[in-house]
Amino acid sequence: MSFQNKNLYDLLGNDVEEDAAPSAPSREVVKKNTSSKKSDAAPASADPAKAKKKKSPTGNEAALKNKNFNKDVAPPQSTATKHSKKPFDRHSRTGKTDSKKKLQQGWGQSDKRELEGEVEGTEDAEAELEAEAEENDESANAIPKKSLQEYLAELELSKQELEGSKKLRQANEGAEQKWTAEEKIEKQQEVFFASTHTKKAKSKAQKEKVFLDIDANFGDEQPQTTRGGFRGGKRGGARGGSRGGAKRGGARGAAKPEVNDKNFPSL
């Protein structure tokens, strides 16, 4: 019985270090000049904007100061809409164009026609002017003449013709004879119950107005107290009132007017 060892990890192929080719050694660069001095190179060009240590303008201020810089910048463009029509929608895609001959046929080559029309128009205008001049000469030579008597006779004839043509309606023309006898028709009410007693209207005589002459006498009004009198009273006046108190019945009023029955007769 033979026995053979197998490396199962060898099947995975993870042993890269042994299979990889050995890397070549790096080449060492040897400089000819071993001095530590810097190479003689030209200095960088200085920026004049950074020399003053100021911030460069931006925005609208930069656009105003640096007008020449904006020439290199493209202007803003409007974005195309999503629903815009195609550029060939309003143009013919057949490739056919109207030639000069077709245009003259369609619209009419009116160069010769316009010239002929102008010539004919001038000829017609000249002929009309000649005809008008002849008519004016004839009318100027033949002036109508008429006497006063002939004119009055013509007026009378025209009046007679006008009066004869008018037909005036005469009075009562076309009246009917049946309406000559006029009758007044009154509506009478039927009496269902005749009353035996007739009501008599009472005649009431009007009363005459009686005017009375009266001598009216009115009592004088109470005397008014004067304004601005002394306030208070005399100092040291008697205390208390009179003995027995105030009189009964109060103060008397103004005198009543005398009434006589003779001045007021009974009605």
Curated annotation (Swiss-Prot):
Q: Where is the composition biased (Basic and acidic residues)?
A: 86-101
Q: What is its main location?
A: cytoplasm
Instruction: Point to the regions of Acidic residues compositional bias.
Output: 117-138
Region (Disordered) residue spans: 1-145, 161-182, 216-267
According to the record's subunit comment, the protein's assembly and interactions are: Associates with mature 80S ribosomes. Binds to the head domain of the 40S ribosomal subunit and prevents mRNA binding by inserting its alpha-helix domain towards the mRNA entry tunnel at the decoding site, where it blocks the binding of tRNA and mRNA at the A- and P-sites. Interacts with eEF2; interaction sequesters eEF2 at the A-site of the ribosome, thereby blocking the interaction sites of the mRNA-tRNA complex, promoting ribosome stabilization and hibernation.
> What is the protein name for this chain?
Ribosome-associated protein STM1
Q: Name one GO biological process term.
A: translational elongation
Kindly list the places in or outside the cell where this protein is found, as annotated in its UniProt entry.
Cytoplasm
